[in-house]
Amino acid sequence: MTIKISIDCMGGDHGPAVTIPAAISFVESEPDAELILVGLADQLWAELKKHKAGEHPRLSVVNATEVVTMDDTLEAALRRKKNSSMRVAINLVKQGQADACVSAGNTGALMAISRYVLKTLPGVDRPAICSILPNQKDGPTYMLDLGANVDCEPQHLHQFALMGSALVSAMEGKPRPTVGLLNVGEEDIKGNDIVKQTAVLLRADHERGTLNFYGNVEGNDIFKGTTDIVVCDGFVGNVTLKASEGLGRFVKSVLTTEFKRNPLTMLGALIARSALKAISQRLNPSRYNGGSLLGLRGLVFKSHGGADAYGYQWAIKRAFDAAKYDVLARISTKIADLMPQSALTPLPEDSVTATEQ
């Protein structure tokens, strides 16, 4: 079965210089993938020809006359640039011409346009960016929100927990994945009012048996793998994500420097070569690139704006896998079962608060 993914090739810090090589590498490694490259056609064709892929049978180009920049306001992105590469790529999902969309562009704009075009699932106020981080148990820790909503109310964090539970249940085959609420301590008395009120909602779900709420977790629990899911607002999540990426690069840099310090340490590096390679791979943030905008009536994936071609390729892979295993339908069913009947009416599409990832 062929899976079609639309790519916003103009998004991110590097645009086609990263998105095109990533698309070529992915489509060559995945025979069931077909990629629709959206952007300024002249630039896309030039990059394709540069990589001798201008006639690839599973790469097609759709022209878009505008580009959403990182500096664009939400109004400009949503109301004025209606033929932007981001908007056109998302429209392809809405029209059924693509199974999923990937963009490294302005996070706020991506969320606003996705909500406007695709709409949210019943009972969901705001989409949340959910992605995975590595942990000591050699498995994934799913974390949300990672930057879509910098300001949240308790009901939003509550919905994030339910959506995260639905996602992990579908992706990992766990009927009752554990949910942790990120806080400054494990004790119930700690945290701000929003976190405390959210904990009350999650405990009520736990008592009803609709959510497996572990309780409050701290930052170090993310990488311990204490819970399957960690819930927080987008401000905290985005800072945590980028701090962890920076730490991974720092550790890799320190290891490289120290093992090159003298002949003896270089010999040690040679002996431990296979282990060091494995460590480097596990700590490489590019391998964890690609977060889903959870809660939409379509699959949209957000790549880090500064991702290189290798990292962007991982974002495409996550979108491909989600479409291949029909994750959207499975999550929709799970959310419908988990969401309370009194769920809030979705907010207007343009009432979005977000940070740029």
Curated annotation (Swiss-Prot):
Localization, UniProt: Cytoplasm
UniProt keyword Plastid, yes or no: no
Record-level GO BP terms: fatty acid biosynthetic process; phospholipid biosynthetic process
A GO term, aspect molecular function: phosphate:acyl-[acyl carrier protein] acyltransferase activity
Enzymatic reactions: a fatty acyl-[ACP] + phosphate = an acyl phosphate + holo-[ACP]
Keywords for the protein's UniProt record, in alphabetical order: Cytoplasm, Lipid biosynthesis, Lipid metabolism, Phospholipid biosynthesis, Phospholipid metabolism, Transferase
Coiled coil: none
Pathway in which the depicted protein is active: Lipid metabolism; phospholipid metabolism
GO CC field: cytoplasm
EC number annotated for this UniProt entry: 2.3.1.274
Pfam family, one: FA_synthesis
Cytoplasm recorded as keyword: yes
Major localisation: cytoplasm
Annotated InterPro entries: FA_synthesis, Phospholipid_synth_PlsX-like
Function in brief: Catalyzes the reversible formation of acyl-phosphate (acyl-PO(4)) from acyl-[acyl-carrier-protein] (acyl-ACP). This enzyme utilizes acyl-ACP as fatty acyl donor, but not acyl-CoA.
HAMAP family: PlsX
Subunit record text: Homodimer. Probably interacts with PlsY.
The family this protein is said to belong to: Belongs to the PlsX family.
Protein name, per record: Phosphate acyltransferase
Annotated organism of origin: Herminiimonas arsenicoxydans
Gene name of the encoded protein: plsX
